[in-house]
Every structure is written in structure tokens, then in C-alpha cells.
Amino acid sequence: MANPLYQKHIISINDLSRDDLNLVLATAAKLKANPQPELLKHKVIASCFFEASTRTRLSFETSMHRLGASVVGFSDSANTSLGKKGETLADTISVISTYVDAIVMRHPQEGAARLATEFSGNVPVLNAGDGSNQHPTQTLLDLFTIQETQGRLDNLHVAMVGDLKYGRTVHSLTQALAKFDGNRFYFIAPDALAMPQYILDMLDEKGIAWSLHSSIEEVMAEVDILYMTRVQKERLDPSEYANVKAQFVLRASDLHNAKANMKVLHPLPRVDEIATDVDKTPHAWYFQQAGNGIFARQALLALVLNRDLVL
């Protein structure tokens, strides 16, 4: 029986049901415990990054190599026919899809990954981030890390801090955790960078508790996960950026009343929002979180490219 993710496009976290998420996370745990260096030995995967990336691109490409796949692609669209000759995204994807078994794609335009699926034929497209919209594979590694550290994905108190308007990671993570029972959210952001209304409406429709706060201190003692984000300079005008960049900064001294097993997560890169003295505390878990990207992305690639995956 084929697994439900075989040859499936993964554009939004909402493309994955709760059962799908559990399957990916279980597969990630197996691959972390038992590496499979030849699982994708005869597959070719395109790594198409139309927007700058460090962790996501290297994590995906490392995942591909560690599963034995061959990797082709680019990290700067300026040096492609699309960038230099004006080729359309549709034509670029139409051609690349004739070469490969899957396409991993990041693009600055919201909806670009969904558009790519219309031109990729039977080749699955995995969204590595489209503008400020979705970042589903970051969410998978976030869920994997939360499950590893907390032992569950339900009945959690989760605080999200910083840029909640443009931060695609918090949109995807909130939608994913809303699929599990009993979770409660605390949103801490300047008014200019508040969580979008459609996310709040979704939580209301599901009867999920949430609240808005003006400081981290207000919720520190309550939370199991403190998810920090940077203010995204590239998505703000200079005056707006200057006003909000230092509004929410986490320091080690702020953690004095945190739960013993509370973990601080961050999608990275960080700028000033987490002081380096936090790194030395047992709550800091963002580097381990980044490392888990290998296993979450390996799991997704393995499932999308293997009809009958047995590990």
C-alpha cells in the first residue's frame, strides 16, 4: 500500500493532515536513529532557490546527499535564464521538471510554489518558503523538536514573539499545532507586526485559546515553548524597522521563572532578539532545532519519493 505522501506536492502545512504530520515525524525519528545512505540512490532532485537562504538550502541539500540522491540546481536566480533572459517561472519549472524526480523551491513571491505545481507535471514540488506566506518544512522540524523535547504535540502552551506579521514560520507552526488537541497560544508582537487576522480567525473557528501580550515577562512562567523570531529587515521600510527591531529581546535574566523544561526555539538567523548569554542556558534549543532540519527534510523526501517506504 502506497504511503499517502507519495508524489504529493508539499506547498502549505495545510496540505498535511494530522496523520500525515505524525507519519513524517515518526519517519524522521527512524532516520535520525538509523541513517539510510542509499534510500534515494537513483533519484535526482532539483534545489531551486530564487531567494537567499543558508540553513534551509544547506539542510535540504545535505538531506538529499545523505539519502544518496543526486542534486542539481542553483542558489541565485540572477545567474539563470529567468534572471538574465527574462524566462518565466512557468517555463523554468516546465523545463526543470523534465530533468528531475522532485523540485525543492524557495521564491520571494507569495504563491510561487503553488504556481509551480501547475507546470511540474507529475514531479512533486516541495515549498522551501514563498515570500511571507508558508514555510512547511521549517514547521516539520519545529514539530519534531517540540515532540523530542516535550514528549508531545498536544496540551502545550506556546508563546510566539517578534515579527508575527511577515514571519512565515509562525504562520505555518500555528496552523500545524492547531491540528493537535489542547494547545494554547500567546502572541507577543508590536502592533505593526501582529499575527495576521486570518490566523486568529482560524484559531477562533477551532475553539483554540489565544491571547495578545505586550511583553515576554507576562507569559514566561506559563509556557512550554518560547518561539522567538527576528524582525525581517528585508520586508520593512527603514523607519519601521528602526522602531521595532529591539522591542522584544530575550536575555538569560528573563528566564529565572521559566519552567524547567521550557525550550527557546528560533528559526534563525537571529539578530539582536536573543542575547548570546541565553545560549549557555538549558532552555536554549535553537541550534539543536536547526540540526533537526536534516531529519525532518530527509523524512519528507523519503516519503514523497518512495511509494512503499519501509524503514
From Swiss-Prot:
Database matches in InterPro entries: Asp/Orn_carbamoyltranf_P-bd, Asp/Orn_carbamoylTrfase, Asp/Orn_carbamoylTrfase_sf, Asp_carbamoyltransf, Asp_carbamoyltransf_Asp/Orn-bd
Pathway linked to the protein: Pyrimidine metabolism; UMP biosynthesis via de novo pathway; (S)-dihydroorotate from bicarbonate: step 2/3
Binding site for L-aspartate: K85, R168, R230
Annotated carbamoyl phosphate binding sites: R55, T56, R106, H135, Q138, L268, P269
E.C. number(s) listed in UniProt: 2.1.3.2
One GO process term, biological-process aspect: 'de novo' UMP biosynthetic process
Keyword field: Pyrimidine biosynthesis, Transferase
A GO term, aspect molecular function: amino acid binding
Annotated disulfide bonds: none
Top-rank lineage group of the source organism: Bacteria
Gene3D superfamilies: Aspartate/ornithine carbamoyltransferase
Any one GO CC term of the record: cytosol
Reactions that this protein is recorded to catalyse: carbamoyl phosphate + L-aspartate = N-carbamoyl-L-aspartate + phosphate + H(+)
Function: Catalyzes the condensation of carbamoyl phosphate and aspartate to form carbamoyl aspartate and inorganic phosphate, the committed step in the de novo pyrimidine nucleotide biosynthesis pathway.
Subunit description: Heterododecamer (2C3:3R2) of six catalytic PyrB chains organized as two trimers (C3), and six regulatory PyrI chains organized as three dimers (R2).
NCBIfam families: asp_carb_tr (TIGR00670), PRK00856.1 (NF002032)
Family assignment from sequence similarity: Belongs to the aspartate/ornithine carbamoyltransferase superfamily. ATCase family.
HAMAP family for this protein: Asp_carb_tr
The protein, known as: Aspartate carbamoyltransferase catalytic subunit
Organism expressing this protein natively: Escherichia coli (strain K12)
Gene it is expressed from: pyrB
